[in-house]
């Protein structure tokens, strides 16, 4: 819950989540589409990956042998509300991303 609230409080993190919500997208495209500095984008994407709000959907290799990751948001929508002494966060998960995460977890066993 705290990671979600922290992400919502940061304009660049919200841009990254929005950009990767409906499709897997390379980091370089996020940098261009969201107009975020390169270093900042990588730092924030790594933070989102560490917190489980973003996942690496796939890794592609270019014809010249370079690897790059496509990332995707785990969240599809959020609803945050406050009720007497309680902060409630309801999340709708991006099913494609959640399935990928489950597949990866189960393949580790």
Give short role names for the model-derived ranges.
Residues 76-109:
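Amphipathic alpha-helical dimerization/coiled-coil segments
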Residues 30, 41-51:
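Basic amphipathic alpha-helical segments that dock to polyanions
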Residues 47-48, 59-66, 85-96:
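Short, surface-exposed, charge-dense and proline/glycine-enriched linear segments
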Residues 3-11, 26, 57-82:
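Short, cationic-aromatic polyanion-contact patches
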Residues 23, 47-51, 76-78, 96:
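Short, charged/polar surface micro-motifs in flexible loops or helix N-caps
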Residues 3-4, 8-36:
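N-terminal helix-turn-helix DNA-binding core of bacterial DNA-binding proteins
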């Amino acid at each position: 819950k705290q990671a979600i609230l922290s992400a919502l409080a940061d304009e660049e993190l919200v841009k990254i989540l929005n950009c990767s919500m409906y499709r897997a997208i390379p980091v370089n495209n996020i940098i261009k589409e969201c107009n975020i500095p390169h270093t900042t984008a990588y730092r924030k994407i790594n933070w989102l990956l560490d917190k489980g709000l973003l996942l690496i959907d796939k890794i592609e290799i270019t014809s010249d042998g370079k690897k790059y990751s496509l990332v995707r948001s785990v969240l599809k929508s959020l609803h945050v509300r406050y009720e007497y002494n309680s902060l409630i966060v309801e999340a709708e998960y991006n099913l494609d991303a959640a399935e990928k995460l489950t597949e990866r977890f189960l393949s580790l066993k």
